[in-house]
């Protein structure tokens, strides 16, 4: 029998082990309900026994009732204990449910974080791949960089970089004004020469400029050079009004003031107004001074420059030719000012593709400069450089190369004497390095290839441009070692020039910081400084920067 009872208990325990949590909770609730009902029933019986006990006397029957009451109290205690344990089980079940719910939330968070981590890993891998591709592209671009620089050099081989114009150092320019007076001269020089030039004009033109007009003229120049057009323009207009009242419209003084006002308008980019004023001044000078007067040639040249600035090369060419004819007639065909006019005319023709005429004009100007000013005059090198640019445009690379070498050789001879085996110009060293590049490769500095480019004594913009252009030509021929030699020499020369400019600016700041600050503020606004010059004929002219074809920036010098 004992074995049977053990088997029954084991079967019951096995059944309990197979119950789910929900089934256990449900069974527990049923047990609680049963225990509550049994407890209520025992309480009723106990109350009934107690009331019966009150009615009975103390005898055997009352003892029996007390014994029953005692048993029922014990049963109630056991029922209450069972209820307490059942409630504890319910509370524990609720707690387990809450723990399970929190565990599920944490698992969901873990899954989400794992997904985010995987996404970040994928993004990192993609970024690393892109970075690797970018580095490969950069390496390829570095390999092609020198070739692309060479292609760019072909487009701007006639770029003439002035060390004092750092901003324009990389822009392509047609050096029209390179043969004319330097644009960077002190504007005050032109102001100081006004009285002497006005006197010469009075002698040649047969009229005398009033002192008041000369004063106004100088004031306008001063204000315009400072960029104070709001003052310069009213001064010109007031002077014009007074002159027309006293002398009439058709008077040389009126033409002079019209020319000055036109140049002020030109600097403000008011080209249409400037052209109208110059045409009016031209008509007055032709009427009062004659069609072949030098002042007429100056006005014609100013008007041609203005048309060239607007890209109207065909309209500018006949004006420039007429100015050339007047200068040849008055000054002679071999005068340096005629050569300046020839250079203006050559560039106008070059922008129209008339290369045969360009060659003729440049060659003629070169002959005049060499004859009248000597082979060492800066205008000779500049004209050769312009002529070489014309050759390059036509594909005449051999002729261009010859001119470039002549410029560099002459620059070397001026500084270090005649060329021999121990004293060679830079282009010879460059070609020697090209020939020896397969035999030896050294990192020699340029100090071993002559001293003029290392010392930067020959640091003119023309020589710097020639170095760059000849270097571009070498690249076209596949002479990369020679090209690098010239390009590095040009870079050093330009750097030395910029250092000199910085030192000069520091000195200017120390001497007169207020004026320098004003000029810097004007330069920051890209306002060109107007420089008026009066020739011996009394014609006011200006050196101006001219935009050609929207890309090339050229300097049109207004010759006298």
Curated annotation (Swiss-Prot):
Positions of TPR repeats: 213-246, 255-288, 297-330, 339-372, 381-414, 464-497
Residues carrying Phosphoserine: 162, 460, 521, 524
Coiled coil region boundaries: 27-156
Any single biological process term in GO: microtubule-based movement
UniProt keyword Phosphoprotein, yes or no: yes
Region feature Disordered, mapped onto this chain: 156-203
Family, per entry: Belongs to the kinesin light chain family.
Subcellular location: Cell projection, Growth cone; Cytoplasmic vesicle; Cytoplasm, Cytoskeleton
Cellular component, GO, one term: cytosol
Organism encoding this protein: Rattus norvegicus
InterPro entries named in the record: Kinesin_light, Kinesin_light_repeat, TPR-like_helical_dom_sf, TPR_rpt
Secretion signal, residue range per the UniProt entry: none
Subunit structure: Oligomeric complex composed of two heavy chains and two light chains. Interacts with SPAG9. Interacts with ATCAY; may link mitochondria to KLC1 and regulate mitochondria localization into neuron projections. Interacts (via TPR repeats) with TOR1A; the interaction associates TOR1A with the kinesin oligomeric complex. Interacts with BORCS5. Interacts with MAPK8IP3/JIP3 and NTRK2/TRKB; interaction with NTRK2/TRKB is mediated by MAPK8IP3/JIP3. Interacts with CLSTN1; phosphorylation at Ser-460 inhibits interaction with CLSTN1.
Tissue expression: Expressed in brain (at protein level).
Superkingdom assignment: Eukaryota
Pfam families referenced in this protein's UniProt entry, alphabetically: TPR_10, TPR_12
Keyword field: Calcium, Cell adhesion, Cell projection, Coiled coil, Cytoplasm, Cytoplasmic vesicle, Cytoskeleton, Microtubule, Motor protein, Phosphoprotein, Repeat, TPR repeat
Biased composition (Basic and acidic residues): 156-176
Protein name from the UniProt record: Kinesin light chain 1
Residue stretches of biased makeup (Low complexity): 188-203
Modified residues annotated as Phosphotyrosine in this record: 449
Protein's job: Kinesin is a microtubule-associated force-producing protein that may play a role in organelle transport. The light chain may function in coupling of cargo to the heavy chain or in the modulation of its ATPase activity.
GO molecular function, one term: tubulin binding
PTM per Swiss-Prot/TrEMBL: Phosphorylation at Ser-460 by ERK inhibits interaction with CLSTN1 and localization to cytoplasmic vesicles.
SMART domains the UniProt entry points to: TPR
């Amino acid at each position: 029998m004992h074995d049977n009872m053990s088997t029954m208990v084991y079967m019951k325990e096995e059944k309990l082990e197979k119950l789910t949590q929900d089934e256990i909770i449900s069974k527990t609730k049923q047990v609680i309900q049963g225990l509550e009902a049994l407890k209520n029933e025992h309480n009723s019986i106990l109350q009934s026994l107690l009331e019966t006990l009150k009615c009975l006397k103390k005898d055997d029957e009352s003892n029996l009732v007390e014994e029953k009451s005692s048993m029922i109290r014990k049963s109630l205690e056991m029922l209450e204990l069972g209820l307490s344990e059942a409630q504890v089980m319910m509370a524990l079940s609720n707690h387990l449910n809450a723990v399970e719910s929190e565990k599920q939330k944490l698992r969901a968070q873990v899954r989400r974080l794992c997904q985010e981590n995987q996404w970040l890993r994928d993004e990192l891998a993609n970024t690393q791949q892109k970075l690797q591709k970018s580095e490969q592209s950069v390496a390829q671009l570095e390999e092609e960089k020198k070739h692309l620089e060479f292609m760019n050099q072909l487009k701007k081989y006639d770029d003439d970089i002035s060390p004092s114009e750092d901003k324009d150092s990389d822009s392509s320019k047609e050096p029209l004004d390179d043969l004319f007076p330097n644009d960077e001269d002190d504007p005050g020089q032109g102001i100081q020469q006004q009285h002497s030039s006005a006197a010469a004009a009075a002698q040649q033109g047969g009229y005398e400029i009033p002192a008041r007009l000369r004063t106004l003229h100088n004031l306008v120049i001063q204000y315009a050079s400072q960029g104070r057009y709001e003052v310069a323009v009213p001064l010109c207009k007031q002077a014009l009004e007074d002159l027309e009242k006293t002398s009439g419209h058709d008077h040389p003084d009126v033409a002079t003031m019209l020319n000055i006002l036109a140049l002020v308008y030109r600097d403000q980019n008011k080209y249409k107004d400037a052209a109208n004023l110059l045409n009016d001044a031209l008509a007055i000078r032709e009427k009062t001074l004659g069609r072949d007067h030098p002042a007429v040639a100056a006005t014609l040249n100013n008007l041609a420059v203005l048309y060239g600035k607007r890209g109207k090369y065909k309209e500018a060419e006949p004006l420039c030719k007429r100015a050339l004819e007047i200068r040849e007639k008055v000054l002679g065909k071999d005068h340096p000012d005629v050569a300046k006019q020839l250079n203006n005319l050559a560039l106008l023709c070059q922008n129209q593709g008339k290369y045969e005429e360009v060659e003729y004009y440049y060659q003629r100007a070169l002959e005049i400069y060499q004859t009248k000013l000597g082979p060492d005059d800066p205008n000779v090198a500049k004209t050769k450089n312009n002529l070489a640019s014309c050759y390059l445009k036509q594909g005449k690379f051999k002729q261009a190369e010859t001119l470039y070498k002549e410029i560099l050789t002459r620059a070397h001879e001026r500084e270090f004497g005649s060329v021999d085996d121990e004293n060679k110009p830079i282009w010879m060293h460059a070609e020697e390095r090209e020939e020896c590049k397969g035999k030896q490769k050294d990192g020699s500095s340029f100090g071993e290839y002559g001293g003029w480019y290392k010392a930067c004594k020959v640091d003119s913009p023309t020589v710097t441009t020639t170095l760059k252009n000849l270097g571009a030509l070498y690249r076209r021929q596949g002479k990369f070692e020679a090209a690098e030699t010239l390009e590095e020499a040009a870079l050093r020369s330009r750097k030395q020039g910029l250092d000199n400019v910085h030192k000069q600016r520091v000195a200017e700041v120390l001497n007169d910081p207020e004026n320098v600050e004003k000029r810097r503020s004007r330069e920051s606004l890209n306002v060109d400084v107007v420089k008026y010059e009066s020739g011996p004929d009394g014609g006011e002219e200006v050196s101006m920067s001219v935009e050609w074809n929207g890309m090339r920036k050229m300097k049109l010098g207004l010759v006298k």
